[in-house]
Amino acid sequence: MSDGGDAERRDRLRHDLRTPLTIVSGFAEVLATERPISDADRREYANRIHAAAIEIRELVDALLED
């Protein structure tokens, strides 16, 4: 792969990893606050964190297989 292709792949990977990490960080921060959160919102935030963690794991697995 050319240097340009490597840079594109790295940029795409950076974006693909940062997006779910931002989701995990943001929703975990909300859950860690002491402000009242409804049970429904708490479940939704936990589900989003879980989905983002699965996405990260799949990206890492794909990287390790390359």
Predicted regions span which residues?
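Short acidic helix/loop segment immediately C-terminal to the autophosphorylated histidine
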Residues: 32-39
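Conserved signal-transmission helix
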Residues: 1-8, 62-66
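Short, charged, amphipathic alpha-helical segments
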Residues: 43-47
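Short alpha-helical N-box/ATP-lid segment at the N-terminus of the HATPase_c
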Residues: 32, 57-65
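Conserved phosphoacceptor histidine of two-component systems
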Residues: 11-15
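Short alpha-helical segment of the dimerization/phosphotransfer core of two-component systems
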Residues: 51-56
